[in-house]
């Protein structure tokens, strides 16, 4: 686990403890006697067992590494069957070796999807594949032609027309 998570957990537990301590009086007898004299019920300041269990579960989930693959295999068992197929494993290993999957644009797109919490649609999957293919190409001219294809062809056509116009005059 990264050291950053430890710092976050410590800071959150300190903040949680401080929030609990702010609402409680330092000397409980004064408030208790005032409440009894005014006829109000005294509210218990101790958290119940359910709250403690939820807090401990939350802290455990903070310290545990997140694994979304376990959720997928539990919900869709066909994924496990198809992943055990030789051709599927071979294709997946070939795809993971592509340099485009490790590009910064794809990482930014993935972090954007995680932040917004939106569902993956066919268009977003197509966009992620497009980014991976474009970024895995090694040729600069090929990358430019894919990215700026129509503008690139327009500029070259305009230059050719100007060249013919200059020679005709």
UniProtKB/Swiss-Prot annotation:
Entry's transmembrane regions: 149-169
GO cellular component terms given for this protein: extracellular region; host cell membrane; membrane
Taxonomic source organism: Bremia lactucae (Lettuce downy mildew)
Keywords for the protein's UniProt record, in alphabetical order: Host membrane, Membrane, Secreted, Signal, Transmembrane, Transmembrane helix
Notes concerning its domains: Has the canonical EER motif, but lacks the canonical translocation motif RxLR, which characterizes most oomycete effectors identified so far.
Entry's localization field: Secreted; Host membrane
Chief place of localization: secreted
Membrane topology annotation: Single-pass type I membrane protein
Chain positions of motif dEER: 51-54
Leader sequence segment: 1-21
Keyword Endoplasmic reticulum: no
Self-association and partners: Interacts with host transcription factor NAC069.
Protein name: Secreted RxLR effector protein BLN03
Similarity remark: Belongs to the RxLR effector family.
UniProt KW tRNA processing keyword: no
Task of the protein: Secreted effector that inhibits stress-induced relocalization of the endoplasmic reticulum tail-anchored transcription factors to the nucleus, thus affecting stress responses.
């Amino acid at each position: 686990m990264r050291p950053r998570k430890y710092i976050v957990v410590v800071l959150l537990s300190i903040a949680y403890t401080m929030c609990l301590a702010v609402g409680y009086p330092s000397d409980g007898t004064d408030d208790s006697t005032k409440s009894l004299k005014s006829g109000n019920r005294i509210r218990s300041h101790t958290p119940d067992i359910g709250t403690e269990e939820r807090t401990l579960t939350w802290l455990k989930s903070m310290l545990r590494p997140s694994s979304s693959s376990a959720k997928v295999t539990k919900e869709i068992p066909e994924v496990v069957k198809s992943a055990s197929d030789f051709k599927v494993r071979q294709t997946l290993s070939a795809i993971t070796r592509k340099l485009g999957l490790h590009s910064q644009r794809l990482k930014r797109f993935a972090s954007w999807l995680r932040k917004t919490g939106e569902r993956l649609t066919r268009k977003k999957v197509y966009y992620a594949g497009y980014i991976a293919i474009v970024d895995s190409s090694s040729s600069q001219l090929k990358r430019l032609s894919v990215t700026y294809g129509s503008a690139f062809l327009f500029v070259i056509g305009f230059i050719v027309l100007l060249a013919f116009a200059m020679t005709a005059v």
